[in-house]
A protein has these predicted regions:
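Phosphate/pyrophosphate-binding catalytic cores of soluble transferases and nucleic-acid-acting enzymes
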Residues: 1-294
Length: 294
């Protein structure tokens, strides 16, 4: 899966791994968050794991700030930053350089965005891209016609600021990422998820979740995570263990589906099925090599 691939690539490209997962930041929650183990890590540095107490809120804005810092530090060491796993919106804060906590989502921005979305629906992606091409040819060369979301984001910035998008810090950030997605047939994926949940139970998830429950986990940010909140009704004696475990499996499958949908909506994701085609790993390495030479 993602963890194994990120570690393989870190060895190959002198990389360091940044976790893009909103739950792996919490200390003491190792099994339910599928946190990388010290054995798996080996000598590969990992970041943004075990940095919060269970009562702390962790936001996308905080993730972006910390991840940006780590990316800079890793790059200064001449290592390759590899962001593994992840919560869709967290990753988007990096790939789109979202200015969180600013007025980015104010009314004017929303109106401009909705206008271009409507134009794209009525006249097609190419028409919208041509408009960008006229206004900012440098940006249009770097943004694929198929990636309407980024084309609209560029038009939005141009219209709102009166400046070229290619002169904005966002422009640089949107081009500094190579997105690699792992996929496989849905039945295979779901079967793996079910088995993984069974394994978590065997490895002590019940004890971990009970500890969180005893700390008042139902009212804590960390208690919202999949694998924990489904067990709380069981600890209260309201449902059977079987029902709770089935609910974890169901929620995990839904989450995986949402993650895949998020990546599929990002036109610049490159997909590989290394479960069915293990040799695809060589293709991924070649891909990264080519990208690094750009």
């Amino acid at each position: 899966g993602k963890t194994a691939l990120s570690i393989k690539l870190a060895h190959e490209f002198d990389g360091e791994v940044i976790s893009g997962d909103s739950m792996q930041v919490y200390r003491h929650l190792d099994i339910g968050t599928a946190k990388v183990t010290p054995e798996e890590m080996g000598d590969v540095p990992h970041h943004l794991i075990d940095i919060c107490n269970i009562e702390e809120r962790f936001s996308a804005a905080r993730f972006k700030k910390l991840a940006d810092q780590k990316i800079d530090e890793i790059a200064q060491r001449n290592h390759l930053p590899i962001i593994a796993g992840g919560t869709g919106f967290y990753l988007q804060t990096l790939t789109d350089n979202l200015a969180l906590g600013s007025d980015q989502f104010d009314q004017q921005t929303l109106e401009i965005r909705n206008h271009w979305k409507k134009v794209a629906e009525e006249k097609g992606a190419e028409y919208v891209w041509e408009r960008l091409n006229k206004l900012d040819p440098v940006a249009s060369v770097r943004i694929p016609k198929s990636n309407t979301r980024r084309v609209i984001r560029a038009l939005e910035v141009i219209q709102k600021t009166g400046q070229l998008f290619s002169n904005q810090p966002q422009f640089k950030a949107t081009n500094d990422f190579l997105l690699i997605g792992l996929t496989t047939d849905r039945p295979v994926l779901y079967e793996r998820i079910n088995k993984r949940v069974d394994l978590m139970i065997q490895n002590g998830l019940l004890e971990e979740a009970k500890w969180l429950f005893d700390q008042g986990g139902e009212d804590l940010p960390a208690g919202k995570g999949i694998g924990y909140h489904e067990l709380f009704p069981y600890f209260r004696g309201e449902i059977s263990l079987n029902e709770a475990v089935e609910k974890i499996k169901q929620d995990s499958r839904h989450y995986a589906k949402r993650q895949l949908t998020w990546f599929r909506n990002k036109a610049d994701t490159h997909w590989f099925d290394i479960l069915r085609h293990p040799n695809d790993i060589n293709q991924i390495k070649q891909f990264i090599n080519d990208w690094l030479k750009k």
